[in-house]
């Protein structure tokens, strides 16, 4: 079981900078704009052989009618509830703020170890100013600089002293990683929240609500998954803020690190150019692809509506013809568990291995019936085929003249492999080697 440390505090005290220092990567978005982190998100850290999960949270604000700030408070409450140790960050450059006092009163009631961290203590003046925070009545004050690392070693010694065990190294290893992608407001966060049964990400009718890629664990059918809810990806010309630009970079990174990409499409809008760009990105990165057409409950239907809609998607995506397509309604919870079964199938297809003997028995017969066409009076003779030990299905065909095999014949071989062995939802790579 991983130990959990939550980083909390009012806006713009450096929580995300400290989070990134602990986990050793720029996972959370950092910006001078207050309220950049809206959701809670997780990273893994280690200190002196002790492993722990770190939760970064949004800035806690009271007395505001802003819809986002109200939901951020809920996210912070959930993080506090999950945590074994709470790091309460304050700003030495500003001194004691009334929100610090209000938040101190709140977390004092949690009955959990709370460590008061005076961030931005990166010069002598601020170091002396950090003593002001003793008036919060939270015990010892730990001055640090998340920017340059000053004081973090001593702080982490204190943090791990509260752990009951050493935790796990890389607890996510081997767990299927699913990136939920799509245009803004396609229903990505609502989908993840519906599966989890909790408000893991903030959901409103306003596009662009999710700014960071939010990671969640999900157990179903005796299997564990990691779902990554991402910010909506839109065209570069429509990106108006630096923060949105960084959000999209995180979404692309989530795609690159995933095993299966779930692309959410709004049924009322149909498949659009940016949907196709995302699918092509997943294809080029050799990821499994599941297309979920959301808001299907809003479409007037007859017996052929789904078939026609699916044909339109496949026509738009040519020559990519393998994604698994499903129609769902997150609002009405229609086919949500079936969608997880589809994701599971695609994940298993991506890792499927075909024995060489079975592969040759089936595919060489097809090659005998339809050999590669001659090029420049050169005849290609394929001797055998084997599957390579790669993350996504790759098949090597050994032949006398690999340079003369055309792309159309590769598509023919891919079609036959799919017909015999069912690789729905995953790309297949064909390579040729000289024998």
Swiss-Prot record:
A GO MF term: GTP binding
InterPro entries: G_ENGA, GTP-bd, GTPase_Der, KH_dom-like, KH_dom-like_a/b, P-loop_NTPase, Small_GTP-bd
Binding residues for GTP 2: 182-189, 229-233, 294-297
GO BP term, pick one: ribosome biogenesis
Record-annotated EngA-type G domain positions: 3-167, 176-351
Pfam families from the UniProt entry: KH_dom-like (PF14714), MMR_HSR1 (PF01926)
HAMAP family named among the record's database cross-references: GTPase_Der
Role played: GTPase that plays an essential role in the late steps of ribosome biogenesis.
Subunit field text: Associates with the 50S ribosomal subunit.
Protein name per the record: GTPase Der
Lineage of producing organism: Bacteria, Pseudomonadati, Bacteroidota, Cytophagia, Cytophagales
Gene assigned in the entry: der
């Amino acid at each position: 079981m991983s130990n959990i440390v939550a980083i909390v505090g009012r806006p713009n005290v450096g929580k995300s900078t400290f989070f990134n220092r602990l986990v050793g990567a720029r996972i959370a978005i950092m910006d001078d704009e207050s309220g950049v982190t809206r959701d809670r998100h997780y990273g893994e850290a280690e200190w002196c052989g002790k492993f722990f999960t770190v939760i970064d949270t949004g800035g806690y604000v009271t007395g505001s009618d802003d819809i986002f700030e109200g939901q951020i408070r809920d996210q912070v409450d959930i993080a506090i509830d999950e945590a074994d140790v709470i790091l309460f960050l304050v700003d030495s450059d500003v001194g004691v703020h009334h929100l610090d006092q209000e938040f101190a009163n709140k977390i004092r009631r949690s009955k959990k170890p709370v460590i008061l961290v005076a961030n931005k203590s990166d010069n002598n003046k601020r170091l002396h100013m950090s003593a002001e925070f003793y008036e919060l009545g939270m015990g010892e004050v730990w001055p640090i600089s998340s920017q340059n690392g000053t004081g973090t070693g001593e702080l982490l010694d204190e943090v791990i002293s509260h752990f009951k065990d050493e935790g796990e190294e890389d607890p996510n290893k081997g767990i299927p990683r699913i990136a939920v992608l799509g245009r803004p407001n396609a229903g990505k966060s609502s989908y993840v929240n519906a599966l989890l049964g909790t408000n893991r990400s903030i959901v409103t009718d306003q596009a662009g609500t999710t700014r960071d890629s939010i990671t969640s664990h999900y157990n179903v059918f005796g299997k564990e998954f990691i779902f990554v809810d991402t910010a909506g990806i839109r065209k570069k010309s429509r990106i108006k803020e630096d923060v949105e630009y960084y959000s999209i970079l995180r979404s692309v990174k989530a795609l690159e690190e995933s095993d299966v990409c779930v692309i959410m499409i709004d049924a009322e809008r149909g498949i659009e150019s940016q949907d196709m760009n995302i699918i092509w990105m997943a294809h080029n990165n050799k990821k499994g692809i599941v297309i979920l057409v959301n808001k299907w409950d809003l479409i007037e239907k007859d017996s052929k509506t789904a078939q026609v809609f699916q044909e339109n998607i496949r026509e738009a995506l040519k020559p990519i013809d393998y994604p698994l397509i499903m129609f769902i309604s997150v609002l009405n919870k229609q086919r949500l568990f079936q969608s997880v079964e589809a994701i599971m199938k695609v994940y298993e297809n991506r890792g499927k291995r075909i024995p060489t003997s079975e592969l040759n028995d089936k595919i060489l017969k097809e090659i005998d019936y339809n050999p590669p066409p001659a090029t420049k009076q050169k005849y290609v003779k394929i001797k055998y085929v084997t599957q390579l030990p790669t993350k996504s299905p790759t098949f090597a065909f050994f032949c006398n003249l690999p340079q003369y095999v055309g792309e159309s014949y590769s598509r023919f071989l891919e079609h036959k492999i799919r017909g015999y062995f069912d690789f729905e939802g995953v790309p297949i790579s064909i390579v040729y080697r000289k024998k």
